[in-house]
Amino acid sequence: MIIHPNFDPVAIHLGPLAVRWYGLMYLVGFILAIVVGRLRLKLPHVAAQGWSAKDIDDMMFYGVLGVVLGGRLGYVLFYKADYYFSHPLDIFRVWEGGMSFHGGFLGVTLAMALFAWQRKRHWLEVTDFVAPMVPTGLAAGRLGNFINGELWGRVTSPDAPWAMLFPGASRDDAAWLAAHQDIAAKWNLNEVFLAHQMLPRHPSQLYEIALEGIALFFVLWFFSRKPRPMGAISALFLIGYGAARFTVEFAREPDDFLGLLTFGLSMGQWLSLPMIVAGVLMMIWAYRRGGAAKAA
């Protein structure tokens, strides 16, 4: 078993200002997105559409607003609506954590629609350009989760070579052990807990980096290197992210205030299913519509 290093969540102290790893990873994610965007400008079919470095900078401004506002509101509405409706001022306490990818996705989608309207471009032309820039940011965000030792995975066998002990999960581990003595006996987890006061879990943040970040980036990057029908790249992002997130959720610990929902699926899985369906329908529409004149 591997013990999580239990990093200090603060990366740098600048006088009274504490720069946290999670915020730093957001910055890294946006920088990586800009780098990928500028690499895309070198592709002939992308350059032919008249995209510029200034367009990327402006997109990122809109994107930052969409991620922060959408991510926070998505967490409030999708995950803890009852709490925040009772404590509305706590919605603004973003430094305490609480962001939702699906909310951020909706926020960015609306932000890109506004950008497209202002630039008099088709909305899907913009999202096709942006889609390959997103996975590197997702990977950076999940790395921030891992450094913080949060959003850990479900309990697994201590014999699994990837099993990891998360110090931050010790209280949850004790509750899990009391409720699952049948599995604990099968995997000898009582002995593990006595020795470490923790249980082995999937490092699901690393799975998400691998699937939602690295794998999805390469799929989108190579797919977008050739002209595609308008909407096809956006559709592939929806399918790829939705499928990756749906899969990883089987190894990720559900939110304790929600647990598993209908059919034993998590909230993340239920929010990912519409993405997959929408992506498939959009891909069919894009190729039936035909033509790559407006491809990104």
Swiss-Prot record:
Task: Enumerate the residues binding a 1,2-diacyl-sn-glycero-3-phospho-(1'-sn-glycerol).
Answer: 142
Q: Where is the signal peptide, in residue numbers?
A: none
For membrane topology, the record states: Multi-pass membrane protein
In short, the EC number is 2.5.1.145
Q: Which InterPro entries does this one have?
A: Lgt (IPR001640)
Q: Where in the cell is it found?
A: Cell inner membrane
- A Pfam family this protein belongs to? LGT
**Domain of life of the source:** Bacteria
Name the residues that span the membrane: 17-37, 59-79, 97-117, 230-250, 265-285
Q: Which GO terms describe its biological process?
A: lipoprotein biosynthetic process
The Swiss-Prot or TrEMBL record describes its family as follows: Belongs to the Lgt family.
Q: What biological function has been recorded for the protein in this entry?
A: Catalyzes the transfer of the diacylglyceryl group from phosphatidylglycerol to the sulfhydryl group of the N-terminal cysteine of a prolipoprotein, the first step in the formation of mature lipoproteins.
Q: What is the protein's species of origin?
A: Burkholderia thailandensis (strain ATCC 700388 / DSM 13276 / CCUG 48851 / CIP 106301 / E264)
Record keywords, A-Z: Cell inner membrane, Cell membrane, Membrane, Transferase, Transmembrane, Transmembrane helix
One GO MF annotation is: phosphatidylglycerol-prolipoprotein diacylglyceryl transferase activity
Identification of the protein by name? Phosphatidylglycerol--prolipoprotein diacylglyceryl transferase
GO cellular component term of the entry, any: plasma membrane
PANTHER family given for it?
PHOSPHATIDYLGLYCEROL--PROLIPOPROTEIN DIACYLGLYCERYL TRANSFERASE, PROLIPOPROTEIN DIACYLGLYCERYL TRANSFERASE
Q: Which PROSITE patterns match?
A: LGT
Q: Pathway involvement?
A: Protein modification; lipoprotein biosynthesis (diacylglyceryl transfer)
